[in-house]
């Protein structure tokens, strides 16, 4: 019956040009439950939640709250109905304090004067009640990613939201912070709050959710009770086939040194400090070395230095015996370096170009694609069609598809196809599965292991500790711009890595 549900989204259809993101989807949320929303990348999960939060208007369908139809035209309407959302990419003002961010838009005032003391009192009370300890006066730019997420949660609680939407909330957290978040969700549930939880991590769904709704290609596949299902069954519902959840990987046989990084330092002029300090390591042919750590600890800057996007302040980089420290990005590519970037939109693709033009971004000047300075479109199309077939890149109009219209998983497949087909000596893969579903993750993991088995050197940068443990032959942990530990995945644990990632331990000091 309708009164059993605090929120009902009935027969929701949402269309974008050329695609039905949500096709007749029904989702019903009970009071006091954690309800997971699972689906492949591009299945329509975030779109559906954006409809509920008032960011999009559906073409068809209706939303009921406590059995009564409601109109949610914008996020203000959603907040007024007690619906709050923590987005995957936080919506915080970095130069504002924690307190200012929490009260932004709902500042208490009396006769036109801001009542900041009153707001502080409420924020402190909420943070103590829910175990979300924060410093109200700290600037957002000075606090950790895990702490920023607490601020986002407090924003919802400050607005007295009873229906809480979490969009991929654990993507940037340490194992210890993930455990804390799960405990916070359980606390909300005990209080009678209702939680919608978008995630692609099946173990988290099994740990905290009561029910799970599965979407596939914009359609509703079903809702299951977690106590009556398995991870394998959820994967099958999500992708329509059996999925290999563990990476099938033989022992590594490392060869010669391919990448040699010596005492690399990179100075951040904006923050007036070193973002990378005296980093030294090697990657051999036929092995996968993973850089693990919480986001913002120098991994991005180190990769920028390795790939030529950022200049070094000190140190030396050698690729297959050749000093490439001062070489251009194009020359590093010619020397045998491939790069799957962290931000596929900013550094991996030109979103308004066709798929075929994106496939030759690093090769269009080569003789096979141009003649007399003019690009040979038929050769580009032929090459792109080959990669699309070989790497199973799915898109609406094949090679002529504008990349912006493709799902994240297929955008990532296109980048991987382009970078692997260059036959590199070194593959630098930065968060290659971020935000992707189990089907796409399984595919990308297979490709990375296949490169290793062909004798390539692979440097993997990942925030996903399951991925780190499954794929790596060696693990390096970064904290505050330094490598604080090296580990064998066969002899370490996720909990031990978490302590090093949080700066609680450092090899050569506390631990060794």
Question: What function would you assign to each model-found segment?
Answer:
Residues 2-512:
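Glycine-rich phosphate-binding loops of nucleotide-dependent enzymes
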């Amino acid at each position: 019956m309708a009164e059993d549900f605090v929120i009902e989204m009935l027969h929701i259809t949402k269309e974008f040009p050329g695609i039905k993101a949500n096709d007749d989807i029904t989702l019903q949320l009970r009071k006091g439950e954690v309800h997971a929303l699972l689906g492949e990348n591009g299945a329509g999960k975030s779109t559906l939640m954006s409809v509920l939060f008032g960011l999009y208007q559906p073409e068809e369908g209706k939303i009921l709250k406590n059995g009564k139809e409601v109109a949610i035209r914008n996020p203000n309407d959603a907040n007024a109905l007690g619906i709050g959302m923590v987005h995957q990419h936080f919506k915080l003002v970095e130069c504002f304090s924690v307190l200012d961010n929490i009260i932004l838009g709902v500042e208490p005032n009396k006769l036109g004067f801001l009542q900041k003391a009153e707001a502080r009192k409420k924020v402190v009370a909420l943070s103590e009640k829910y175990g979300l300890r924060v410093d109200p006066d700290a600037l957002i730019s000075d606090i950790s990613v895990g702490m920023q997420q607490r601020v986002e949660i407090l924003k919802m609680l400050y607005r007295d939201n009873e229906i809480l939407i979490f969009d991929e909330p654990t993507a940037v957290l340490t194992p210890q912070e993930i455990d804390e978040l799960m405990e916070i969700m359980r606390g909300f549930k005990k209080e009678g709050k209702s939680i919608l939880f978008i995630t692609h991590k099946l173990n988290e769904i099994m740990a905290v959710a009561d029910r799970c709704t599965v979407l596939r290609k914009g359609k509703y596949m079903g809702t299951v009770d977690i106590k009556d299902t398995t991870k394998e069954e959820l994967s099958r519902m999500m992708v329509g086939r059996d999925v290999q959840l563990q990476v099938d990987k033989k022992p590594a046989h490392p060869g010669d040194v391919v990448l040699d990084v010596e005492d690399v330092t990179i100075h951040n002029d904006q923050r007036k400090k070193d973002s990378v300090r005296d980093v030294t390591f090697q990657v051999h042919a036929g092995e996968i070395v993973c850089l693990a750590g919480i986001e913002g600890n120098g991994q991005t800057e180190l990769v920028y230095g390795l790939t030529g996007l950022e200049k070094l302040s000190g140190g030396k980089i050698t690729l297959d015996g050749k000093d490439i420290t001062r070489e251009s990005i194009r020359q590093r590519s010619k020397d045998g370096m491939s790069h799957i970037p962290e931000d596929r939109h900013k550094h991996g693709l030109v979103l308004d170009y066709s798929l075929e033009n994106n496939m030759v971004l690093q090769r269009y000047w080569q003789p096979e694609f141009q003649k007399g300075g003019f690009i040979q479109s038929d050769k580009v199309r032929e090459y792109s069609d080959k990669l699309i077939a070989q790497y199973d890149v799915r898109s609406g109009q094949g090679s002529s598809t504008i990349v912006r219209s493709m799902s994240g998983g297929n955008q990532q497949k296109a980048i991987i196809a382009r970078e692997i087909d260059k036959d590199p000596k070194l593959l630098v893969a930065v968060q290659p599965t971020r935000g992707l579903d189990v089907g796409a993750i399984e595919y990308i993991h297979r490709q990375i292991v296949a490169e290793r088995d062909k004798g390539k050197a692979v440097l993997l940068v990942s925030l996903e500790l399951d991925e780190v443990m499954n794929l790596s032959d060696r693990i390096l942990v970064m904290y505050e711009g330094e490598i604080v530990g090296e580990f064998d995945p066969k002899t370490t644990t996720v909990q031990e890595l978490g302590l090093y990632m949080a700066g609680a331990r450092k090899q050569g000091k506390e631990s060794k």
